[in-house]
């Protein structure tokens, strides 16, 4: 009001913008927030892919646990929970023979900043299943459509994998992040808490870049982030630029036969003029926790910056 009174704000110009004149465009007709369905557009337009043959094996692999489950690395059509964990163990061991492995899962807190988004994604009509290691494994869509079932599954996977890695006595680290604030590390048959990686945030999207940064601080020179999430991509670009990382950080999907990976260094170098503005651009045009304005999407926002 003060700025208006001294003619620092032109009201006529201000009300040309949708956010000022039509705040209801942030919401659907039923009152729910309007979350974007196409946030990956910004990643597809900006990422720089390179041949996987030109990249050496990593020192560290950071795996998005939720993405791994959605990708169904190994999901038995019929079987028990243990069968699923057997397949996940095989996948993790494909990295841990030559690299430290950080496996990061989402946490499911009530009334968190992500609650609305998760509620919109799940089917509230599906009942929760009670899971156990030797109990029957529900279908993938059933598990992944219930937060309660998914949380049980994550807890079982995290505990069972840590126990198995302890018996194998790998020389490389296996660090799993699940419900507890402090991740658990297993190495040389010993388990310990990684207090330095403590986090109270519920989103793996935030935790993954944090753990990448921790690995870089330990002088790791090559890091693979096995994840296809747009939020993670943008956060990695942001941290690479602002923290001036010198290590090689690459993103790849969950299939072993992919011929290309996304190079964060090359992406930042190509788009360094707009990297400082990407997080704000992404947020204002809609992300997991921020509704988007009608007809103002990623492409339109990027065209304003480029």
Task: Identify the role of each PLM range.
Residues 1-306:
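Noncatalytic, typically N-terminal accessory segments of nucleic acid-processing enzymes
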């Amino acid at each position: 009001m003060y700025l208006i009174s001294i003619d620092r704000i032109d009201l006529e110009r201000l009300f040309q913008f949708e956010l000022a004149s039509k705040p209801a465009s942030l919401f659907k007709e039923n009152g729910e927030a309007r979350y974007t369905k196409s946030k990956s557009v910004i990643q597809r337009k900006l990422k720089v892919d390179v041949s996987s043959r030109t990249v050496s094996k990593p020192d560290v692999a950071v795996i998005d646990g939720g993405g791994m489950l959605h990708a169904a690395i190994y999901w038995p059509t019929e079987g028990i929970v243990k069968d699923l964990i057997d397949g996940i163990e095989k996948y993790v061991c494909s990295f841990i023979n030559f690299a430290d492995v950080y496996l990061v899962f989402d946490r499911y807190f009530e009334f968190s900043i992500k609650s609305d988004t998760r509620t919109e994604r799940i089917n509230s009509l599906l009942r929760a299943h009670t899971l156990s290691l030797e109990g029957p494994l529900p279908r993938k869509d059933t598990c992944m459509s219930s937060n309660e079932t998914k949380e049980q599954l994550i807890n079982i996977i995290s505990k069972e994998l840590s126990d198995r890695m302890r018996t194998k006595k790998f020389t490389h680290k296996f660090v799993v992040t699940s419900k507890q604030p402090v991740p658990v590390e297993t190495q040389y048959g010993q388990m310990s808490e990684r207090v330095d990686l403590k986090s109270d945030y519920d989103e793996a999207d935030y935790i993954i870049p944090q753990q990448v940064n921790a690995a870089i601080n330990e002088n790791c020179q090559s890091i693979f982030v096995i994840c296809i999430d747009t939020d993670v991509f943008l956060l990695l670009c942001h941290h690479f630029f602002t923290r001036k990382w010198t290590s090689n950080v690459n993103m790849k999907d969950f299939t072993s036969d992919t011929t290309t990976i996304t190079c964060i260094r090359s992406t930042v170098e190509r788009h360094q003029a707009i990297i400082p503005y990407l997080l704000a651009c992404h947020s204002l045009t809609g992300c997991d926790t921020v509704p988007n304005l009608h007809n103002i999407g990623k492409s339109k926002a990027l065209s304003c910056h480029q």
